[in-house]
Amino acid sequence: MKIINEIYDRTIEDEELKYLRNNTCLLDIETTGFSREINHIYMIGLARLENDKIKVTLLFADNRSEEKDILIEFINYSKDVNRFISFNGLSFDFPFIKSRMNHNGIEYNFMEYEHLDIYKECKKLKDILCLGNLKQKTFESFLGIEREDSFDGGELIHQYKLYEKCNDEECYHNLITHNLEDVQGMVELLIILRYLHITDNIDNSTISEITNTNGEIVAKITTDYNIPKRFVIKSGFYYILFEKNIIKTILKPNSCTLKYYFDNYKNYVHLLNEDIIIPKQLLNDNNKNNAVPCKKSNCCIDVEGLYLPVFDKMLFEDEKLFKENLSSKETYVDISSKLNDSLYLKKYIIHIIKYRLN
């Protein structure tokens, strides 16, 4: 068994420190396959904060018979750990370790620890950030993190078998480099968690630079929350760019005619000769013979306007909401009178952001 210690020589940001304090340990394992029953753990990568530096410790089994040795060393290492941080550790690493400990007759209780699984926390970012997959290297690539290592965990199985067979130095280098960069990469990845908190204080942001050109509304929202890399959310009705602490928005309302449906349709009648809807209490001797009770499907009026979709009806419950027809699930607001209303536009833009990001 080998124990490799490295100091990850970089400045630790405050955002990272809040995750790494209080005896927190980052963990990543390498295995000879995906079956907990028949495959082995050949390396456990660990890292923790020591004297404001990240100290990485790799527990490496020179052969499969040393699996028990690195598991026991891992227990010794983690005696004063309060929390683990991993990437997909709750689904892979920790169940694998538990199974292999059982196989080796070692008792250990992972339920005593807190766990932060970056993969689990960030799964929803795949679509938001337009990532091709949820691999650690894909998140690192989005953040601009570069690696020396070019292997994935599956390819390293063959490298480990070669190392077991003939102590190949190149294979050893590849194995150590991969796990080292996996563990170091998790430190770098902590910043990705910022994307989960963009909306936390967004209601206190400010809106400015509102312009209305060629039917599009352009606005800038300034927040107190910085993100490391820009990204975009968009649809046919909006384009929203997030860059550092600025949110640049283009709203694209649809100029068309939609229907407004009255509540309590039984309280309305349809005047056939005038083709209008009126409340029953407005009936009189002059028009009652031309009136028929409204149905739910026709108790509406057509309204021309500039429409944008609504994703949270409760937020706009004091406004008229419009639809294409009664069975339409989509509802819209008419912003014709709100084009220069900065507070309203801010409210509308933030409601889109919360819908897409939360």
Positions of PLM-derived features:
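Short beta-strand scaffold segments in enzyme catalytic cores
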Residues: 44-46
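DEDD superfamily 3′-5′ metal-dependent exonuclease/proofreading module
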Residues: 1-27, 32-39, 49-358
